[in-house]
Swiss-Prot record:
This is Imidazoleglycerol-phosphate dehydratase. HAMAP family: HisB (MF_00076). GO terms for cellular component: cytoplasm. InterPro entries: IGPD_sf (IPR038494), ImidazoleglycerolP_deHydtase (IPR000807), ImidazoleglycerP_deHydtase_CS (IPR020565), Ribosomal_Su5_D2-typ_SF (IPR020568). Keywords: Amino-acid biosynthesis, Cytoplasm, Histidine biosynthesis, Lyase. Signal peptide: none annotated. It is found in: Cytoplasm.
């Protein structure tokens, strides 16, 4: 089974996380950042992962450390759960519409971390959540999972819709990229390693 779990405690956050890549979309997400809880819940559902997260942090300061550290831990567990990556499709892409918004996410599980993001959010906040933290979360996730992640919001006017479409598209792209393809023998690279 492709799964991983960890607990990470710092002076700023305390996070426990379990991930099953080949799941059923079951989520048990408990964080001090309600908007991230919502995004992780739908990420799990649309990626067909099983994910549990218990994250507490210094949200009396702001949501930055908790959001960033969830991205770090989720990325680390994604990398660990994927193991040697034998037989995976490696690449995945998805377009997701949400009302007036269209988001696109493309991933390569290449072991070369990079985030390219094109999204101009009209609002600086969704509720109490600072929208600049979306980039922070995605970058830390890509860095720790060691994936190449491209995120484009082609258009949209509602910031909540734009971010939600990103998380859904990322989930669907990762679901595709992590799928075992019976035609792929070994590592999906001419170098023989990822």
């Amino acid at each position: 089974m492709r799964q991983a779990e960890t607990a990470r405690k710092t002076n700023e956050t305390n996070i426990s996380l379990t991930l099953e890549i080949d799941g059923e979309g079951k989520a048990d997400i408990q964080t001090d950042v309600p908007f991230m809880t919502h995004m992780l819940d739908l990420f799990t559902k649309h990626g067909h992962f099983n994910l549990t997260v218990d994250a507490k942090g210094d949200t009396d300061v702001d949501d930055h450390h908790t959001t960033e550290d969830i991205g770090i831990v989720l990325g680390q567990m994604f990398k660990e759960a994927l193991g040697d990556k034998k037989g995976i499709k490696r690449y995945g892409s998805s377009f997701v519409p949400m009302d007036e918004t269209l988001a696109q996410v493309v991933v390569d599980l290449s072991n070369r971390p990079h985030l390219e993001m094109r999204a101009a959010f009209p609002s600086q906040k969704v509720g109490t959540f600072d929208t600049e933290l979306v980039h922070e979360f995605l970058w830390k996730f890509a860095l720790e999972a060691r994936i190449n992640l491209h995120v484009i919001v082609h258009y949209g006017t509602n910031t909540h819709h734009m971010i939600e479409a990103i998380f859904k598209a990322m989930a669907r792209a990762l679901d595709e990229a992590t799928t075992i393809d019976p035609r792929v023998k070994g590592i999906p690279s001419t170098k023989g390693m990822l």
